[in-house]
Structure formats: C-alpha cells, structure tokens
C-alpha cells in the first residue's frame, strides 16, 4: 500500500459524519430546487454530485449555468467551499437571501465568510495530508457526496447514458 492509499483510508474515517449527512439529506429532500455554488476543482466534484442528484429526480442547477431557475423560499442554495470564503461565491449569498432561499454551506472551514452567512453549516475536517496538488479537498467532497447519494432513496433513479 502506498502513502496515498494509507492517507486516504485514514482520512475517509474522518469524513463519516452522520449529523452532517442527515442535515444535507434533509435539505435536499425538502427543497423544490437546489442551486449549487462551487468553484475550481471543488466545483468539478460538485457537478458530479449534481449529475447523480439529477438522475435521482432532483431539480438541480449550478451558479455557472446560463439558465438558473427562479429561486424562492422552497429552494436551497448549497455553497460547497473548502476555504469557506471563496470570493467569487460570496455574491451569491446576497442573491439567495433576496430570493428568500435557504442557504447551506458544506465546507472544511466553518470560520469562513460563506459559512458565517449561511443559515446551516455542514463542516468536515480538513485533510491532514496535502498531496501533489497541495489539496485533497475535491477528493474529500467526492467521498462526502457519494456517501450522501448512498443514503438517498433510489426509486426515481433514471440512468441517462445512451450506450
């Protein structure tokens, strides 16, 4: 087993957080629409999660989409941020508040500005090892999101590949 494997086996134990998972799952299930705000490599991991949710029948959008549905009090804006203070995401908090949209931060840093402004926070422990790219954040989010998917009902799952 190499160093990467040892680090990840150890780290995934830290990412199992039933209270956070319940909070995120409840927010997803209770929302009419879900808009995700996430940037960079974390944004890529989030888009993978969005695809899974879409295949399960949830109505999802990303802040970078050209057509974001009108948001309201039955919807949620989920901010996925490793730092908790991604500058380009901060403006979306004000938009969500104006729409009376619920807000949730999924982060490794609950002390960041985004976390302070969101109604709910799901904080996870920062990876101890930094790896080649100086961060394992996006891989941590992939693991977190896959755990969440594993707890959601699959009755409405639709496989969208055409092969």
Task: List where the protein language model places each region.
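A short, well-structured juxtamembrane/interface segment
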Residues: 13-30
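Glycine-rich phosphate-binding loops that contact phosphosugars or nucleotide phosphates
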Residues: 33-144, 148-149
